[in-house]
Structure formats: C-alpha cells, structure tokens
Amino acid sequence: MKCDVLVLGGGGAGLAAAVSAARMGAHTVLVERHGALGGMATAALVHSICGLYLLREEPGAVLAHHGLPAEFAARLIYAGAASGPVRMGRLDVLPHSPPGLARVADELAGECASLEVRLHTECLAAHGAGSVESVELSTRGERTTLTPRTIVDASGDAALVTLAGLATDQAPSDRLQRPAFIFALHTVEVAALDEAGASALHTSSPLQSPPGSSHRVASARSSAPRAAARKSM
C-alpha cells in the first residue's frame, strides 16, 4: 500500500503532523500502538498539558504556538474536557480529562477525509538502502507493508529511526525538559492539602510530612467535599 505521509505515534506531535498533512490533501496514515490517540496524556493518564503556554514570570497565560495547538486547546475546553489554564509556579498548564482528550483527538482526526488512523498497530521493520522505502506494520497480528513518500517518527523514542539503523541526535542536557511525576488526588480537602504542602517547604526534609498533616488529610477523606489534582515536579 502506498501513501504520501506515514506518521508513527499518535501523541500530540504525531496528531499535529498527521492532521496538518491531511488538511493539505496528503494521503496520510497515522499509526498508534495503543487503543486511543493522545500519547502519554491518555495512555499514562498525564492529566495536564505543559508547554502549551510561554514560560513567564508575569501572571497571565500566553500561547506559545497558535494554529493547531490553540485549536486543540479550544476544542478541549469547548467539549468540557479541559479547564484553565492553571498557574503552577512559572508555568501555565491546561488540566484535562484523559478520556475527554482521547475523544477530542479522535474527532479531530475523523474530520480529515485523507487521514487513516490505525490503532493497536506497531512498526515491525523498516526497509531501504540509506533511507526508509517501506515499513512493515502489525495490527493485532495482521501484517501490512506501507510505501510512504514521507515519514514522521513521532513515537517519542525514535522507534522507526532505530529500526532503520539511522543516526539519532539529542539536545544537550541543559536544553531537555525535566521529567515530572503526574498523579491525581480525589476526595481531598484542598485547603488542608495546600497547608500541608506549604509547611513541608519549610522543613529540613521536603519528604517529611509536617506534624498533623497525615491526620488532616485522613480526616478530609471522610468529608470529601471535592476532588483535586496536583502535579509534582
């Protein structure tokens, strides 16, 4: 099977590349190994989009990129799948519902007539001399071969590039985004949680809970006034 563009990886970068190519009229195939689009936002339940807004000392979120990123953020908010942005230190992030993001991503891709999305699909091999000429895919055990004119590897770990034996390059350490541990808390009294966190910042060990904080959080579980989400850097 021939196509104009093959995009490997259905996360934010892959979705943007595939939709942009399809909107230009290119016959595009988007391959995603999981059962939904969205990348780590859906597969790993990373419930906030970081990098959508400029890093600023001043308050007030400013979009870093207009066009498709702004459109996708607006679609999330309109669909009730996101709210914000929310300020976290110098960062502005957009909290979202992972299932809601998957739904909006699916709708966005579905609007493109020349875009074919293949979920539960992995790349098995890449063939070519000096460049990739064909790619073998497996969708739940069914193998197919694609011959694309252009390939975008948005897998997150250069999966196709590695299979092809091509060279890779990485930005210097000081230019890489630091990893974050994302988690959600439910049925927590937010005021008590904020108080405990503020107290922890002034202790000798940030990992040591301030006196009484465990009791306050435990008591909050029983009252459960509302849910909260936090991001730990």
Model-derived segments and their meaning:
Residues 160-233:
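Rossmann-like dinucleotide-binding core of oxidoreductases
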Residues 8, 146-156:
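Short hydrophobic core segments
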Residues 10, 139, 155-156, 164:
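Glycine-rich, N-terminal phosphate-binding loop of Rossmann-like dinucleotide-binding domains
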